[in-house]
Design a protein with these regions (language model features):
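Bacterial N-terminal signal peptides that target proteins for export
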Residues: 1-13
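C-terminal segment of classical bacterial N-terminal signal peptides
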Residues: 14-24
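N-terminal leader/targeting segments and the immediate start of mature chains
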Residues: 22-56
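Polar/charged side chains located within well-ordered beta-strands of beta-rich proteins
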Residues: 43, 57-59, 211, 230
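Solvent-exposed N-terminal domain segments of exported/luminal and surface proteins
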Residues: 46-103
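Gly/Pro-enriched, hydrophobic low-complexity segments
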Residues: 148-238
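Short, surface-exposed loop/turn motifs at beta-strand boundaries within globular domains
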Residues: 32, 46-54, 68, 139, ...
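Flexible, processing/modification-adjacent segments and terminal tails
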Residues: 91-167, 177, 188-192
Length: 238
């Protein structure tokens, strides 16, 4: 029994040592350190430049492939660096016919889906604007790694435990323009079983400012999709 316990203790010690060594190796990788520094610098500078613009955003909310609501917003960036939205208009699918009980059930379900849609959209927003401090933290903890096989002139970075334990974010970064090209995120709301996947494509304005062009957010448990498109970027009159 004593021999078995000693063997198990040795295995645990080896596992901890290997994990620590891998974390240290990742944190000491000069190439990784350089790429993370470039992404942090580019993200911070781009966020500052984007704050000078206003634009329009359209959200199309679908459940099980059926469009339920379309909403348009005017978007600007406030003094605190957070996006501020003013609703410009919306259209919703016509309510089904039926008695009061059925209409009550439908209205309750609609409110539930609306709240859920707001939650997944808010979660996506935290990923589509990469935080330099969270990127640095992921690097220091050994949760960032370079992936092979990307397109020429790009670097693919896989980041785990970025915002929540067990999440992952795959970032494609252009070495030529020093901009993020795309993000693929696997995350969740309050429970890891309440999965949310996010696919983001970026585009560049003529002035060289990078922005989210499209985002598709999938709330798996409710089979909800929120498709977002940003357009009509204008320098704000300040």
């Amino acid at each position: 029994m004593k021999t078995r316990l000693t063997f198990l203790a040795s295995l645990v010690a080896i596992s901890v040592g290997v994990a620590f060594a891998l974390s240290e190796a990742a944190a000491q990788n000069p190439q990784m350190e350089q790429k993370v520094a470039e992404i942090k610098q580019a993200s911070a500078a781009n966020k500052q430049a984007l704050a000078r613009y206003t634009w329009q955003e359209q959200q199309v909310i679908s459940v099980k492939g059926e469009v339920k609501k379309t909403v348009s917003y005017q978007v600007s960036v406030g003094p605190d660096g957070q996006q501020q939205k003013i609703e410009l208009g919306s259209s919703a699918a016509p309510p089904p016919s039926g008695g009061r009980i059925k209409q009550h059930i439908v209205a309750k379900k609609r409110d539930e889906f609306q709240e859920y849609g707001q939650q997944v959209a808010a979660l996506a927003k935290q990923y589509t604007q990469p935080d330099p401090q969270l990127l640095q933290q992921a690097y220091q903890q050994g949760n960032a790694s370079l992936q092979l096989g990307g397109a020429p002139g790009t670097v693919t970075l896989l980041i785990k435990n970025y915002l929540k334990p067990g999440d992952s974010m795959t970032m494609v970064f252009s070495e030529g323009t020093k901009t993020i090209q795309s993000l693929q995120i696997a995350s969740y709301l309050n429970d890891p079983n309440d999965a949310v996947t996010i696919a983001v494509q970026f585009a560049m304005l003529s002035a060289g400012v990078n922005h989210v062009a499209t985002a598709q957010i999938n709330g798996v448990s409710k089979q909800m999709t929120v498709a977002i498109q940003n357009f009509n970027y204008q320098l704000s009159q300040m």
